[in-house]
Amino acid sequence: MKRLCLWFTVFSLFLVLLPGKALGAVDFPNTSTNGLLGFAGNAKNEKGISKTGTTGGKNGQIVYIQSVNDLKTHLGGSTPKILVLQNDLSASAKTTVTIGSNKTLVGSYAKKTLKNIYLTTSSAFGNVIFQNLTFEHSPQINGNNDIQLYLDSGMNYWIDHVTFSGHSYNASGSDLDKLVYIGKSADYITISNSKFANHKYGLILGYPDDSQHQYDGYPHMTIANNYFENLYVRGPGLMRYGYFHVKNNYSNNFNQAITIATKAKIYSEYNYFGKGSEKGGILDDKGTGYFKDIGSYPSLNKQTSPLTSWNPGSNYSYRVQTPEYTKEFVTKYAGSQSTTLVFGY
């Protein structure tokens, strides 16, 4: 009898200590910071001063999120946590959840959707990873400030293998909502291996006012290995003030892709622009930023802003692929996934 009790105790300890799973848990891409690149990684500023890379909730408690209330409870604060969606989360109306710091929010392979859930920063929090998520929202939530991922403070954010699925739209309609806003003092961000689709407006990057020059230099941002499909404008984005490294992305079915606005420093490399490029809308250049492109397809013209002297190679090391490879890769691997994540570089 004693031997049986001892065996049961040892077996119970084995269950408690077994890594990566818990009772009732779900499979998820527990990849830590594998695949992290660009400004959210180990990068330097313009003075050559290095910063640490984004770690999110690394080494923190794994918490399985089953409800919107769970998400509100655990996404705030500064305690490191890895938050795994065990259920798809949905709200009937716009529901805002505040982002804290030192968090990884990751969708499981089976359940990964946030519908009408709007994530926003507060104060100077940061060091957050968003991975393997699908953002959806109702078409009637379409005001100017209706943006599902809103980052305006803190540093070190990594948005990876995330899908913003959008919805049908009328290009001449009154929709003003966007998919993503990153600006004000938010800094050192990478968007990678993600998909943005089916929306009138895509991404707005940098403080959205041409007279607020105190935000010059924000954000430092890498946009790499992403797929922009059927965004009428702003995919990859409308860019102001910051440093934007835009490499190996595929934009298709667009009216305007890159909008160059006030004091944006944009270094574009080896992107592929598909249907829509024949209309001449790859560059929407206001003439007030700085821009350079190398190797994109087709060749970019209609540039009126001066060439940027900035090169992201002074901030971090990186590699590039051809535009043709990029198109094939992101079509297959960008966005949230139901199996293993594949990372571009």
UniProtKB/Swiss-Prot annotation:
The lineage of its organism: Bacteria, Bacillati, Bacillota, Bacilli, Bacillales. It catalyses: Eliminative cleavage of (1->4)-alpha-D-galacturonan methyl ester to give oligosaccharides with 4-deoxy-6-O-methyl-alpha-D-galact-4-enuronosyl groups at their non-reducing ends. InterPro entries: Pec_lyase, Pectin_lyas_fold, Pectin_lyase_fold/virulence, PEL. It is found in: Secreted. GO terms for molecular function: pectate lyase activity; pectin lyase activity. One of its GO terms (cellular component) is extracellular region. Residues 1-24 form the signal peptide. Belongs to the polysaccharide lyase 1 family. This is Pectin lyase. The active site is at R234. It comes from Bacillus subtilis (strain 168). Its EC number is 4.2.2.10. Pfam families: Pectate_lyase_4 (PF00544). Catalyzes the depolymerization of pectins of methyl esterification degree from 13 to 75%, with an endo mode of action. Cannot degrade polygalacturonate.
